[in-house]
Amino acid sequence: MAAQIHRLRDKAGETEKITINLGYVDLGHIDLLVQEGFYSNRTDFIRTAIRNQLLTHGEEVRKSIVRHTLELGLRHYTSADLEAVKAAGEKLHIKVLGLASIAPDVTPALALATIESITVLGALHASKEIKSALADRIG
């Protein structure tokens, strides 16, 4: 099965919303920097801070990706991909850093027959039925 790996770009449509809890003083510092024009808004500050930390730890992240044999970027699994895995009598251990997606035409039965485990550092896009069927295999 040929790998379909695509590098993710940071576009508005390719983001995942997160919620964080900050102390009042930290939030006040962020608001002050926004007010002074250092950042356009709180989100700009937080994204910049996260990118800076990722750059700081970039080498460690790269080594960890290699050590864990993670696919980097976008990995999409179609019904045809999983049918090929099933025909070969194999099972997948999916490991993705980025976005893993399972096509809408994949049935829960096909997913159960072909996916042994899923580890996603990022986001998993799949139907509610697929996520429910694979719940004990998602880690």
What are these regions (language model features)?
Residues 1-25, 34, 43:
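Short Lys/Arg-rich basic patches
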Residues 37:
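C-terminal His-loop and adjacent cap/lid subdomain of alpha/beta-hydrolase
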Residues 124-125, 138-139:
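Charged, polyampholytic interaction/assembly segments that form long, compositionally biased interfaces
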